[in-house]
């Protein structure tokens, strides 16, 4: 039976369809004859206890110069019978949180929201990994620049990053004796006012930062290793990393088994976990990526697996 699939995303005009996971989900929904609806960015609202948005019928095409057609926008209540894909990219700022609160009201009115709005509020992508300390490298999250500096000195090399970034932005590699360490910490913590994360530098990054996708807590059998290029230490695709598919190894599956059940319990139906060597470094719940690369390299249809789960009601 055709469903109404409503997508909350960043402007569709600016996406790169060859790598865009949201676009792959829309293609799969359309292939299944579901009705696609696009939420005008920034248009979610609440009126007398009901969530509304300016939405338009959407058609998509796998054509890099002409990939979508929109119908007329109209104010529509969100709720009963709708599948809402919440796919806005970070930062998870106040406006993002407000949108998830409005989506919680739509969920209470009968919509199926993916991922669960409460989980999107609760699970910071850097902090969430620390729910599973047995899987993580030595990590310190603090505003205290002195403590962060001592951590770097103890580990000898460390990665320093903000809690609200994505795509490799504002990530620093530092070491004991680095003359720039103080200014890096001042910048990341805003002079001791903002939390920052310090994590032991993992030499295995040269072999790739592995993105493992989970659907309802179960891992896809292949991951995408994002391999830094040249003198770069970041593997993120947005930072120029090269993506190479690999089958999951035994330890990858162990990490997924630690993380997956808790993600499923929280309604996080489509999740990306990042693994370097034997260590979990991040859990991505807002808008996990790398689906299209894995589909292309492994002959998969990951969006189809997600829609199979959605259509059964989860």
Swiss-Prot record:
HAMAP family: GSH_S (MF_00162). Residues 125-311 form the ATP-grasp domain. Binds 1 Mg(2+) or Mn(2+) ion per subunit. Pathway: Sulfur metabolism; glutathione biosynthesis; glutathione from L-cysteine and L-glutamate: step 2/2. It holds the Pfam family GSH-S_N. Its cofactor is Mg(2+); Mn(2+). It comes from Xylella fastidiosa (strain 9a5c). Its EC number is 6.3.2.3. GO terms for cellular component: cytoplasm. This is Glutathione synthetase. Mg(2+) binds at residues 282, 284. Keywords: ATP-binding, Glutathione biosynthesis, Ligase, Magnesium, Manganese, Metal-binding, Nucleotide-binding. Belongs to the prokaryotic GSH synthase family.
């Amino acid at each position: 039976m055709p469903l109404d699939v409503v997508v909350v995303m960043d402007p569709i005009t600016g996406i790169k369809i060859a790598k865009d996971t949201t676009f792959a989900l829309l293609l799969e929904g359309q292939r299944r004859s579901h009705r696609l609806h696009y939420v005008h960015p920034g248009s979610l609202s609440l009126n007398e206890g009901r969530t509304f948005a300016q939405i338009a019928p959407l058609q998509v095409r796998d054509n890099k110069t002409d990939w979508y057609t929109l119908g007329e926008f109209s104010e529509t209540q969100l709720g009963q019978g709708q599948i809402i894909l919440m796919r806005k990219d970070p930062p998870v700022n106040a406006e993002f949180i407000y949108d998830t609160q409005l989506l919680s009201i739509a969920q209470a009115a009968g919509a199926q929201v993916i991922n669960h709005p409460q989980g999107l509020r609760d699970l910071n992508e850097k902090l969430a990994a620390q729910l599973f300390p047995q899987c993580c490298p030595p990590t310190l999250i603090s505003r205290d620049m002195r403590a962060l500096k001592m951590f770097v000195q103890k580990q000898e090399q460390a990665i320093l990053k903000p809690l609200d970034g994505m795509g490799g932005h504002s990530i620093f590699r530092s070491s004991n004796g680095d003359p720039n360490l103080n200014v890096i910490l001042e910048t990341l913590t805003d002079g001791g006012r903002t939390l920052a994360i310090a994590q032991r530098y993992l030499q295995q990054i040269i072999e790739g930062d592995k993105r493992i996708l989970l659907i309802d807590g179960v891992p896809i059998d292949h991951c995408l290793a994002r391999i830094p290029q040249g003198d770069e230490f970041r593997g993120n695709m947005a930072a120029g990393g090269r993506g190479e598919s690999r089958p999951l190894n035994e330890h990858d599956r162990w990490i997924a088994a630690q993380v997956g059940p808790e993600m499923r319990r929280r309604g996080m139906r489509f999740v990306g976990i990042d693994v370097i060597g034997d260590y979990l470094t991040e859990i991505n719940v807002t808008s996990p990526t790398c689906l299209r690369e894995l589909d292309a390299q492994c002959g998969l249809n990951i969006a189809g697996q997600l829609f199979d789960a959605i259509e059964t009601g989860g």
